[in-house]
């Protein structure tokens, strides 16, 4: 069983890796270089999440582009290059669709953005790392059929050639 830890805090990452975690789900960029070095030292993988801010607790809005992939690609290119310089050999890119942003409170806007990103995730594979996507719940859209949300989004993610669903 592979244990993963979701964090942007370096001390939490150290504790989790020391306890046996083999995957860090990095939800911030402020300490990414140190995180990559730490993961490499522990022979762990890192899921690099796209975050429009220093970490997922300090964001307000995300750009709502007609095509979000170029913006995400630019971010991931920088992070992958830095990770490689730090000795990290295993990683995933994650468009970060599960994070809260002020301008995605309207469920129709958020779901449209998520669907567009899922369907175009295959374009991130050119960066050389597999793509990971978290599956939304979309409670306000699916209501009592909320259990249908993850299968719905997993189909879109599969069409977009997502490598890892969580």
What is the predicted function of each stretch?
Residues 1-2, 10, 17, 23-38, ...:
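Active-site-adjacent loop and "lid" segments of alpha/beta metabolic enzymes
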Residues 7:
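Active-site loop-to-helix "anion-binding N-cap" substructures in soluble metabolic enzymes
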Residues 71-92:
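CE4/NodB-like, metal-dependent polysaccharide N-deacetylase domain
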Residues 91-101:
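Short acidic, glycine-rich surface-loop motifs adjacent to enzyme active sites
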């Amino acid at each position: 069983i592979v244990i993963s830890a979701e964090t942007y805090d370096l001390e939490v990452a150290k504790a989790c890796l020391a306890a046996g975690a083999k995957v860090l789900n990095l939800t911030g960029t402020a300490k990414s270089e140190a995180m990559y070095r730490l993961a490499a030292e522990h022979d762990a993988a890192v899921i690099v999440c796209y975050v429009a801010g220093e970490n997922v607790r300090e964001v307000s809005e995300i750009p709502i582009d007609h095509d979000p992939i170029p913006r995400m690609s630019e971010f991931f290119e920088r992070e992958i290059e830095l990770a490689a310089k730090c000795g990290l050999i295993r990683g995933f890119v994650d468009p970060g669709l599960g994070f809260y942003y002020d301008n995605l409170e309207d469920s129709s806007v958020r779901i449209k953005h998520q669907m567009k990103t899922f369907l175009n995730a295959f374009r991130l594979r050119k960066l050389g790392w597999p793509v990971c996507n978290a599956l939304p719940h979309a409670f306000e859209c699916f209501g009592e059929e909320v259990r249908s949300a993850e299968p719905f989004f997993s189909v879109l993610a599969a069409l977009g050639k997502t490598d890892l669903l969580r």
